[in-house]
Amino acid sequence: MKEENYGVEPRWISEEEFAEAVDRVFDWLSASTPLKVVRERLDKMGLTGEKARFVVDVARTRFKAKVKFSRWREVFFTPAGLRWATPEDVGAALQERLKGYSMADLGAGQGGQVIHRQESEETVAVEIDPLNASLALRNVEVYSAEAEIVVGDALDESLARRFDPFEVIFSDPYRGPTSTSRTLEELEPNPLEVMKLYGRVERAGFVFELPPQIREERIPFDAELEYVSFGGEYNRLNVYTGELRRCSKSVLILPGGFRIEADPPYRAPPSPTDPFSREFGPYLYEVDPAVARASLLGEAVAELPREFYLLERGRRTLLTSPQPISSPVFRRRYRVLRRVRTLPEVREALKEEGFSKASLRFRISPEEYWRVRRSLEEGLPEGREKATIFKVSGVYLVAVMEEV
């Protein structure tokens, strides 16, 4: 991962002055101390210019780290480092599969993966950016993990030979902030080059944590493709080779750890239907996006004790069923109250059902979204009851969200 230039010496990060300054600034900001006052206090501590900016950035980033890390009050990330860091639950699930193996982490960033490694699992992490490497070491200490951090280029042949004894080669390659990252060649280090260089010796396997945009047809080697969702969002595509491979395709839904594993031939998805067919609802299910992206819809519903029909597939995948059911494969469940064909009918349905607000869940431009939403909500009673409006095959579905 490439970091912006802060102009600070990486070795300073290992000194107690740095950690103490970050902790103090975090406490001051937690107490709503104005930033001007914070900088004045740092100046009195002898921290000015780039050092002060760096300390403030790391301290402020802790507040945003809350959504990714349980020890967010203690971690050391820059804004860019946190942006690319693997969420703690996602990293822990991956490292659980690598438990007991020695591992070399190529391109460790600021330590989002190696914080899960234990003393019994020999681990070396390589990072080309010295500043990132120093922060990674700090985060390893925060989590009481065990990993050696090495500054170097993972594709350097002399460095690669050092890792010949390691059983697993792991890499979460860097992709620039403007990159679409739809091919392996865009990534740094390129997984294909990693496999060529590190494949000279026999290993348990390679593991790559890839951007979710990459399609399976872009991966030209035999591997298990693990589609990971976190908090209802498609988050990662993990790739496992060798003895680490369990199947051809899998889905991991976090938190919770629900898994689907499958090999060809894959099950057919539920039969399609439309809003006015006899197979329709009234229950509507929004499928977890990792399930949809993996094309394992048939496997996801095969063991459920209800019959489902496919209502929509594309930007979101919607199923319908005559009875309610709860399952980790469903991101949300709705109960459809009305099926109408025009927006004036939607507005009338909202009024009759006692709703005060409406959320639109169909393709519409941002400008049109608010115009249509305001027109639907105009004149509705005050309150908190919110309806969700879908549009499928030209039909508007007025629904209310239920607990899954």
Model features per residue range: what roles?
Residues M1-V404:
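SAM-dependent transferase fold signal centered on methyltransferase-like domains
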